[in-house]
């Protein structure tokens, strides 16, 4: 009997200790970040931070900002309100190299093992951050819930190399040579493990990806980056690649920066693919901006009319269909009339 009590007591202490361990508090310099607590600390010699939600969601979902974590934070703020953590480690000017991967692995292990963060993370890659997130996703696809990338670099020959139509950045191109250990430019040009290469691990893991780009981006031209990636993923049969295209970015940044008008698009994408509960996601309607984007960009649209006798009658649905055709004259619509009358 005494042995049983001792066993139960030790088990209780063990469980309490494990719970405390997995919910260890972050120590470091704390500050306010848009109403949330931000803690800055070191991972080895590298500075990192975590922004904590006021009430963590079940299963501790989190967003990992690769680079420029203070740029386009609208989606992060929305996710923090839903209980997500937001994290970043500054790996320096390593441009997504294998050396950067070692730093990232240390950071990931710290957050998941010591602080109980979810094993599957949402990756966010802004600009050169694309080099980091794809390096990680191909090396550790089982750890990625989804990827949301903002004007991402998908081939360092395009940026910083400037070997296509993009402007390039010679200082960063030299850094690529040093960081990746290339002896000459020929080796860099022959390198075949950019984000656009060796995509099978991402396809096999069926990792959902969304890119938001500007068509007039002269720094990271989409034709040399996102669209090559898109074509190769489609050839491999990857069904979860989405592109949000903006016609013009800011002239002051050669089209590379832009204002986020509809952060709900990226927010809903992330929520859909990183909701680890068994609850069916329900999103309140927040306008028709998504539909407008599809109608304007793809010139195609499918509109379904669902309802009872009012929907079945000719007046209302035909009026809406006519209005859409006038509003988007270049768009080819497929109207699905599925109203069912409630009376005979």
Where are these regions (language model features)?
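C-terminal catalytic histidine-bearing segment of alpha/beta-hydrolase fold enzymes
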Residues: 51, 224-278
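Alpha/beta-hydrolase fold nucleophile elbow
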Residues: 115-127
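Hydrolase active-site cap/lid region
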Residues: 135-186
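The feature captures the conserved acid-bearing segment of alpha/beta-hydrolase catalytic domains
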Residues: 166-227, 231-234
